[in-house]
Amino acid sequence: MTTLSAARTRVSNWLFDHALPLWAERGVDAQGRFFEQLDFDGRPVIGLRRRTRVQARQVYVFCEAAALGWAQGRAVAKVGLDQLITDRRRDDGLWVAATDDDGVVVDETPDLYDLAFVLFALAASHRVLGDARARPLAVETLAAIDRLMASPHGGWEEALPPRLPRRQNPHMHMLEAMLAWQAIAPDPAFEAAARVSLDLCKHRFLVDGAIREYFTENWSADPATGHVIEPGHLEEWAWLLKQSGDDSDLATALHRRAAAQGYRDGFAIREIGPAGEVLDGGRRLWAQTEAIRTGLSFGDAGVSALIAAVFDTHLATAVPGLWVDSYDADCRSHDAAAPASSLYHLMTAFSELLRSNA
C-alpha cells in the first residue's frame, strides 16, 4: 500500500525535478508570457488565444513554487506578473479575456472567471513576491467588478455584456481568491465578496444536497442543464467551505456526496445527475486534484492510492512533467497536448500534500 510519505516523495520529485523546470523553460516565451499548451514532445503550441485565466494561474503556480523552496519560481512569476499587468488591464479597472502570442488583445471581454484568477494571482504575488502593485490592483479590480458586474439577482454577471447560463464556477473561484486575500491582507471588501459567494452557495447553488452548475439570470435551474452536478466541484466547494470556517457540516456533506456518487473505478468522473446517475463517465485531471486536496483535509485513507493512480495514468507521459488532461468513459484519451491550465490544479493539491505532516 502506498503511504502518504511515499506519495510526498514521488510528488516532490515530479514537481521540482521535472514539471516546474520543463514549464519554466519551454512553457514561457522570450517576453515572459505563458504558452497555453505544450505538446507531448514538450514543445509549445503556437497560435492559440492566450487566455487571461491561464496567465494568472501560471503566476500563482510559480509564486507557490517559490514559496515551497523552488527559488527559480520567483523570476518566472515576476516577469509573468509584469506581462499580465501590461497586456491585460482595461481602462475601467477590469481585465481582458485574451491576447494573441504577441500580447495584442483579441478579446476585450471582462469575464468573471478570468477576473477571479487575476485576483488569485495578485494574492500570490503579494504573499510571495511582496509586489507593491498587487494589493492596490486587487482592491481596484474588485471595486470594478462590484461597480460594473453586480447582478440585481445576486452575485456578479458572467461577463460584460451579460450572458447565460449563469454558472456557480466563477463565484466559487471568486471565493477562492477572497479567502487567499483574507489570509494575508484582510479587508472588509474581500470579506464582503467572500460572503456573496458563500451565501449564493447555500441559498442558490445548493439543491437537494448537491451543488448545481447552471442557472438562469435569477438563479433558477437552467432548463436544459440545471440538473448537472460535477463531483470535482463538490470536492472543491467542500475544501473552500472548510477553509472559510463557514459551514463545516455542509463541507462534510458535499465531500461525502462526491465519495458516494461521483467516482467510478477510483476516479472522480465528469458529471452525475441528481440521483447519482452517470451523465458523463469521462474524467479530467483537475477533478482528481480536487479530490486529493479535499481528501487530505479530511484525513481520508484513500488519498495515497488516488495519487498513485493519477501518476500511473494522467502523469504517465513520455516526457516527464507533462500530463494527460482528459479520458473518456472508456479510459481513452484523445488529447494532443498538455494544457498549462492544469498546473494550477496540480499545484494546489500537491502543495497541500507537501506541507502536510501526515
Residues covered by each model-derived region:
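Glycan-recognition and catalytic cores of secretory/periplasmic carbohydrate-active enzymes
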Residues: 1-358
